Amino acid sequence: MFEHAGQGYAGHGTLCGALGVCSCLINLVIYDKNFTYAAVIDRMMWWYAQMHFPTERFDNISNFPGQIKAKAMTPLCHTSVSKWTLTAGVKVTSKEKYERCAKVAGEVVFTVVHYLNEYFAGRWTPAKWTPSEETTQCIECHGPETYQRYANEDGLNHQQGHMECLLCHPDHMKALLTKRPTK
């Protein structure tokens, strides 16, 4: 049913397929008037971005236990996988990479089931996304006003998202930092 989500949706390397599939499932089972599903999905996304994958959870059933880990930094498949393959020194078409992604998918599902159990037991407390200092500086100018404490009122209001800006825009930040007065 969700085979199309593999390799970042039909090989495009966009959103990690495990995140997309779990987002659909979260939406199906936690659709309420408070839009709690969005908070659960948001938490899942930034949890993923902060994780060092693959974990050891599935090593006992793995052909490649003890694989090298790399921090995902983003929910994007191509970034997460590329960082890992470069760190591990393997090709994107290797059996090691496919095993890594299977472990990541299992870890995402395991974590989402934990979140859902918290929700249905009445213990769910949504954590709030907190951007890095660098991303906060980007949001001050580019973010929508709905990022209340991060964006200023006269911001450009043409950026949305909770990803780290520097992953794709490192030169922009360098230029910004050279123009700012030092403290």
Name every feature range the model reports, one short phrase each.
Residues 5-14, 93-97:
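A short glycine/serine-rich beta->alpha loop
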Residues 1-3, 83:
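Acidic-glycine-rich active-site phosphate/pyrophosphate-binding loop
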Residues 136-145, 162-171:
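The canonical Cys-X-X-Cys-His
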Residues 1, 28-43:
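Phosphate-handling active-site elements
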Residues 10-24:
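Conserved phosphate/anionic-ligand binding catalytic regions in large, soluble enzymes, centered on
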Residues 148-152, 175-179:
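Short Cys/His-rich "knuckle" micro-motifs
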Residues 153-160:
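Short linker/helix segments within small regulatory modules
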Residues 22-26, 41-117, 124-129, 136-139:
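Amphipathic alpha-helical interface segments
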